[in-house]
């Protein structure tokens, strides 16, 4: 008997809901939301598009182009949220400050936020932004799952070594509440593991399929 993860079907039907420049423009604060965060060029949009089997999140050759909170509906009560990318040098400082202000407002106010998926480039993990997000997750008690993206850029052995190293650093500095995995959008590596995390946070149980 096979087991079907219901989050898969929902992600494949994901649709764009709205973009918000500030928290007041977000959907009603109810249901389930999972936010996707990451430093600019960490592969956040590619990961979202891979998980939804669509081109919902904008990808760009110029990192840092995501300037809004972008909401994607899975069903009437479940949403994925693409948060602004951070850290790109060519983005003006006032715009960076604007992004940070509204990111902090979103993270600090949304009662329906069930967890954060944090993207780190496996070749350059644990940036200052990543550590800031880990600090926030620890202080707030928010579940966090890390995707070490672009794993296809490293050999299997090098990717595994980086995974173990980052796991150890996070465990020492932030405890055992953060989970982590390797991920590659082009190779679809780690997609099923990411689906299981989403399903757990959104309270969707695996269902047997005859």
Swiss-Prot record:
Keywords: Cell cycle, Cell division, GTP-binding, Magnesium, Metal-binding, Nucleotide-binding, Septation
Entry binding sites for Mg(2+): 45, 66
Gene3D superfamilies: P-loop containing nucleotide triphosphate hydrolases (3.40.50.300)
Keyword Nucleotide-binding: yes
Pfam families membership: MMR_HSR1 (PF01926)
Cofactor(s) it depends on: Mg(2+)
Molecular function via GO: GTP binding; metal ion binding
Residues binding GTP, per UniProt: 38-45, 64-68, 82-85, 149-152, 182-185
Residues of the EngB-type G domain: 30-204
GO cellular component, one term: cytosol
Superkingdom in the source lineage: Bacteria
One of the GO BP terms on file: division septum assembly
SUPFAM superfamilies (UniProt xref): P-loop containing nucleoside triphosphate hydrolases (SSF52540)
Family: Belongs to the TRAFAC class TrmE-Era-EngA-EngB-Septin-like GTPase superfamily. EngB GTPase family.
Functional summary from the UniProt entry: Necessary for normal cell division and for the maintenance of normal septation.
NCBIfam families: GTPase_YsxC (TIGR03598)
HAMAP family: GTPase_EngB
The protein's name: Probable GTP-binding protein EngB
Organism: Pseudomonas putida (strain GB-1)
Lineage: Bacteria, Pseudomonadati, Pseudomonadota, Gammaproteobacteria, Pseudomonadales
Gene name, Swiss-Prot/TrEMBL: engB
């Amino acid at each position: 008997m096979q087991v079907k993860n219901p989050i898969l079907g929902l992600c494949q039907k994901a649709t764009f809901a709205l973009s918000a420049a500030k928290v007041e423009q977000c959907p009603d604060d109810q249901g389930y939301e999972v936010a996707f965060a990451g430093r600019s060029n960490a592969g956040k949009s590619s990961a979202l598009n891979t998980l939804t089997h669509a081109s919902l999140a904008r990808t760009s050759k110029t990192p840092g182009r995501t300037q809004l909170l972008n909401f994607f509906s899975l069903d009437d009560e479940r949403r994925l949220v693409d948060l602004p990318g951070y850290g790109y040098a060519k983005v003006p400082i006032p715009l960076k400050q604007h992004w940070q202000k509204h990111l902090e407002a979103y993270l600090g106010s949304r009662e329906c936020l069930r967890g954060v998926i944090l993207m780190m480039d496996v070749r350059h993990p644990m940036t200052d932004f990543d550590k800031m997000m880990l600090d926030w997750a620890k202080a707030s008690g928010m579940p966090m799952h890390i995707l070490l993206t672009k794993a296809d850029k490293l050999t299997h052995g090098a990717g595994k070594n980086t995974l173990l190293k980052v796991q150890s650093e996070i465990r020492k500095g932030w405890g055992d509440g953060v989970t982590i995995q390797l991920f590659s959008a082009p190779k679809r590596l780690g997609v099923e593991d990411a689906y299981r995390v989403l399903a757990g946070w959104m309270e969707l149980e695996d269902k047997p399929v005859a």
